[in-house]
From Swiss-Prot:
LRR repeats: 63-87, 88-110, 111-133, 135-159, 161-182, 185-209, 211-231, 232-253, 254-278, 280-300, 361-384, 385-408, 409-436
Enzyme class: transferase
Highest classification ranks of the organism: Eukaryota, Viridiplantae, Streptophyta, Embryophyta, Tracheophyta
Cofactor entry: Mn(2+)
Protein name: Receptor protein kinase TMK1
Superkingdom as given in the UniProt entry: Eukaryota
Organism: Arabidopsis thaliana
Cytoplasmic face residues: 504-942
Signal peptide from the UniProt entry: 1-23
Bias type Low complexity, positions: 449-459
Record's catalysed reaction(s): L-seryl-[protein] + ATP = O-phospho-L-seryl-[protein] + ADP + H(+); L-threonyl-[protein] + ATP = O-phospho-L-threonyl-[protein] + ADP + H(+)
Positions of the Protein kinase domain: 588-869
Assembly with partners or alone: Interacts (via extracellular domain) with ABP1.
Transmembrane segments: 483-503
Length: 942
């Protein structure tokens, strides 16, 4: 009887488990059929069998439970079924590089899921509970999706086994979560969040993290990067194109660091020796910051991108700084190297235009840093500048004590440290030194008394004991009366002072504008250097009848000696009479015309000081729909864009109905002139090395536009006539952002000016949909033109060859037989050159893929072209050739005040996987660095 009962119990349990297993497998069947319906794959896809476990790219267990869905790179469209969350045994969901749209369904509860790959699709939203209950999750890749703005959810905390989190170009907003540190994710090694909308500072909770690859570039992140010095596992750090500031940290603990990209930030101070001595370092990019001190010297094995002129080094080549510069930098170090000082304190002579510095016969006599929002302490290094007569540090946020070393200055007359947060005893200065410490409540008190719980009142008296209590009681009523009387008098005095200030301000404005230009004046706004309301610091070296200024002159108080005065001019907008502008263009003479286009005519001009400019006279129809304020707002955005491969917009001119843009002058004209009209113009044909370099220049400029953290631009009309060359035969992209100035609505001429047939991406021409991939397509056409020497549309050719892109792809399919005939006959084809041309041709084919998602980003193009420019060098270089390019040369700095430089991001890559191609041609262009996830695209890391 007992045996029978046991047998029945066993049989019941077995049948129950069998039925549950059957129910689970039926649930998987239902979920997979829903997935098939929502994706609607073609019949050739291999999903026709009624059993999903027999479908291609699907892996199941022996009990028919689905564990893997691996359908990446399949060209699938449609949406994802919410029934996916029922696949409770699913371990890998790989859907990358498709065209799937709609929301990402909730995956909460998929406790077995280890890998989630959704990159490079068109998903538009992601639920907040997407990671809820995913306790086995190890890798997340959701890059390059047009999600609605979202923040990394708290539910990610459940995935404590996470090793890789990649969400580049995924519209992530908010701040970087503090829970991404080692306490929650001890195994996290890849953290990629490039090109999103993250703000705030790096959380200190990242300290101790073993992350090896950190991509946070292209955001709005601020603050310092001190936390990096405690992330000792780092191998790759890309923080470029943010708003980081402060000095670089100590890198001595980062023994495995190989690649460091910090370009396009506001870092200050010297490059630390700990970075220079790293044995593991291979690539470093520090261009376009405010780094100071001597030019750093890295090991010969390190690929360095460090444009000397885009930082604030004392010299243009390695060498010791002037002793005066060394002392001033040590002083700045106590203030944590303020950006405002770093922007001004450039070069090796502090007596030439350094903000707050005045000299006599080459000796520093005055340091005036009042109202500079300084923090930190007063450096003892002030005492090393023996010629100092005045030190003005008032109205800042300085702490600490006044250094004893200042008393040793033999020529010191004035020390003003008023309105700070200093404490401690004031050192004994000579009797003839005027010391102003007003506005420091704790001056005269030592630090121990300030930190004591029973510290004295601000007056300094302890008042302890019985007598003290009695004194306080006796003083109470008189003090109360004094407070009332003082308040009344103080109020009356305040009203009087305010009235006086308003009167002075009014009189000053009358005086300031009484001699200004009439309504005919043209305002040329200088390049933006910071806040919209911030004036530009200029130094007046002379005067001119053609250039006036609105200025205030400030003289340091307390002296009548001329040599002791510091004069600084606050200049707002430069005023240039319209007669001057007309004069330099011969009244907009046709002889001065450089070219014309959809936006208007461009004239050449030369200012009185020899500076050449290009004046674009906008067509009335282009901007008729724009109000003054709107036009000014649009231009204000454009003037913030600074890059060495973008034509500098110096300012805008307004005079009645006329609206003019003032650009830097590019003497060698358009790329079109050198590529298609060289023979008629009497020019030399472009060498292949020149074409490569020009292509790289354009790619870098457009990459910068696409990656702007504060305002993303799409050019929409990229073509050779919008690419201008300087005397050094380096390229700059012109007319970027001008489509924004065109009026909107059906009457807009945007369709005429926002693109040129032959360069238009198919989706833009058909639907008007604009993404950065529109520019990528145009760039691919330009690459084809550089290779063939033919125009994008050439009606002189046979009908089947008129359209360059179609003809080029047909020719390239048969590389050996026909493609060599398609190459420009002026290019000298040796073996190395031909290999280089083939690589660029492959890149051009990718860029001109029909579907936008199949095209790479501009960062990918930069990677490919920069490797060719660096590694492929023709053996026969003619030093007498005026068109020869020294790849190491600096670009000319005709307009330094408004230009900044972008550097290379030659971060190492090697071939691993291939982009899909419409013509099924075998490709050899590397699409991701070795060892990185399959969903990698180079935009993620630039």
């Amino acid at each position: 009887m007992k045996k029978r009962r046991t047998f029945l119990l066993f049989s019941f349990t077995f049948l129950l488990l069998l039925s549950l297993s059957k129910a689970d497998s039926d649930g998987d069947l239902s979920a997979m059929l829903s997935l098939k319906k929502s994706l609607n794959p073609p019949s050739s896809f291999g999903w026709s069998d009624p059993d999903p476990c027999k479908w291609t790219h699907i892996v199941c267990t022996g009990t028919k439970r689905v564990t893997r869905i691996q359908i990446g790179h399949s060209g699938l469209q449609g949406t994802l079924s919410p029934d996916l969350r029922n696949l409770s045994e699913l371990e890998r969901l790989e859907l990358q590089w498709n065209n799937i749209s709609g929301p990402v369904p909730s995956l909460s509860g998929l406790a077995s899921l280890q890998v989630l790959m959704l990159s490079n699709n068109n998903f538009d939203s992601i639920p907040s509970d997407v990671f809820q209950g995913l306790t086995s999750l190890q890798s997340v890749e959701i890059d390059n999706n047009p999600f609605k703005s979202w923040e990394i959810p708290e539910s990610l905390r459940n995935a404590s086994a996470l090793q890789n989190f990649s969400a580049n170009s995924a519209n992530v907003s908010g701040s970087l979560p503090g829970f991404l540190g080692p306490d929650e994710f001890p195994g996290l090694s890849i953290l990629h969040l490039a090109f999103n909308n993250l703000e705030g500072e790096l959380p200190m909770s990242l300290a101790g993290s073993q992350v090896q690859s950190l991509w946070l570039n292209g955001q709005k992140l601020t603050g310092d990067i001190t936390v990096l010095q405690n992330m000792t596992g780092l191998k790759e750090v890309w923080l470029h194109s943010n708003k980081f500031s402060g000095p670089l940290p100590d890198f001595s603990g980062l023994k495995e660091l190989e690649s460091l990209s910090l370009r396009d930030n506001s870092f200050t101070g010297p490059v630390p020796a700990s970075l220079l001595s790293l044995e593991s370092l291979k690539v470093v990019n520090l261009t376009n910051n405010h780094l100071q001190g001597p030019v750093p010297v890295f090991k010969s094995s390190v690929s360095v991108d460090l444009d000397k002129d885009s930082n604030s080094f004392c010299l243009s080549s390695p060498g010791e700084c002037d002793p005066r510069v060394k002392s001033l930098l040590l002083i700045a170090s106590s203030f944590d190297y303020p950006p405002r000082l770093a922007e001004s304190w450039k070069g090796n002579d502090p007596c030439t235009n350094w903000i707050g510095i005045a000299c006599s016969n080459g000796n520093i006599t005055v340091i005036s840093l009042e109202k500079m929002e300084l923090t930190g302490t007063i450096s003892p290094e002030f005492g090393a500048i023996k010629s100092l007569q005045r030190i003005i540090l008032g109205i800042n946020n300085l702490t600490g004590m006044i250094p004893q070393e200042l008393t040793t200055l033999p020529n010191l007359k004035t020390l003003d440290v008023s309105s700070n947060k200093l404490f401690g005893k004031v050192p004994g200065f000579r009797s003839n030194v005027v010391v102003n410490t007003n506005g420091n409540p704790d001056i005269g008190k030592d630090k121990s008394s300030l930190s004591s719980p029973g510290s004295s009142s601000p007056s300094g008296g302890s008042g302890s004991g019985i007598n003290g209590d009695k004194d306080r009681r006796g003083m109470k009523s008189s003090t109360f009366i004094g407070i009332i009387v003082g308040s009344v008098l103080g109020g009356l005095l305040s009203i009087f002072l305010i009235g006086l200030l308003v009167f002075c301000w009014y009189k000053k404005r009358q005086k300031r504008f009484s001699g200004s230009e009439s309504s005919n004046a043209v305002v040329v706004h200088p390049r933006h250097s910071g806040s919209d309301n911030e004036s530009v610091k200029i130094t007046v070296a002379g005067s001119s009848v053609s250039v006036g200024g609105i200025s205030d002159t400030y003289t340091l108080p307390g002296t009548s000696e001329v040599g002791d005065n510091i004069q600084m001019v606050e200049a707002g907008n430069m005023l240039i009479s319209i007669q001057v502008l007309r004069s330099v263009t011969n009244n907009f003479s046709s002889d001065n015309i450089l070219g014309s286009g959809g936006f208007g005519v461009v004239y050449k001009g030369e200012l009185h000081d020899g500076t050449k400019i290009a004046v674009k006279r906008m067509e009335n129809g282009v901007i008729a729909g724009k109000g003054f304020a709107e036009f000014k707002s649009e231009i204000a955005v454009l003037t913030k864009v600074r890059h060495r491969h973008l034509v500098t917009l110096l300012g805008y001119c307004l005079d009645g109905n006329e609206k003019l843009l003032v650009y830097e002058y590019m003497p060698q004209g358009t790329l079109s002139r050198h590529l298609f009209e060289w023979s008629e113009e009497g020019l030399k044909p472009l060498l292949w090395k020149q074409r490569l370099t020009l292509a790289l220049d354009v790619a870098r400029g457009v990459e910068y536009l696409h990656g702007l953290a504060h305002q993303s631009f799409i050019h929409r009309d990229l073509k050779p006539s919008n690419i201008l060359l300087g005397d050094d035969m380096r390229a700059k992209v012109a007319d970027f952002g001008l489509v924004r100035l065109a009026p909107e609505g059906k009457g807009s001429i945007e369709t005429r000016i926002a693109g040129t047939f032959g360069y238009l991406a198919p989706e833009y021409a058909v639907t008007g949909r604009v993404t950065t991939k529109v520019d990528v397509y145009s760039f691919g056409v330009i690459l084809m033109e550089l290779i063939t020497g033919r125009k994008s549309l050439d009606e002189s050719q046979p009908e089947e060859s008129i359209h360059l892109v179609s003809w080029f792809k047909r020719m390239y399919i048969n590389k050996e037989a026909s493609f060599k005939k398609a190459i420009d006959t002026t290019i000298d084809l040796d073996e190395e050159t031909l290999a280089s041309v083939h690589t660029v041709a492959e890149l051009a084919g990718h860029c001109c893929a029909r579907e936008p998602y199949q095209r790479p980003d501009m960062g990918h193009a930069v990677n490919i072209l920069s490797s060719l420019v660096e590694l492929w060098k023709p053996s026969d270089q003619n030093p007498e050739d005026i068109y020869g390019i020294d790849l190491d040369m600096s670009l000319p700095q005709a307009l330094k005040k408004w230009q900044a430089y972008e550097g290379r991001s030659d971060l190492e890559s090697s071939t691993s996987s291939l982009l899909p191609s419409l013509d099924n041609t075998q490709m050899s262009i590397p699409t991701r660095p070795y060892g990185f996830a399959e969903s990698f695209t180079s935009v993620d890391g630039r």
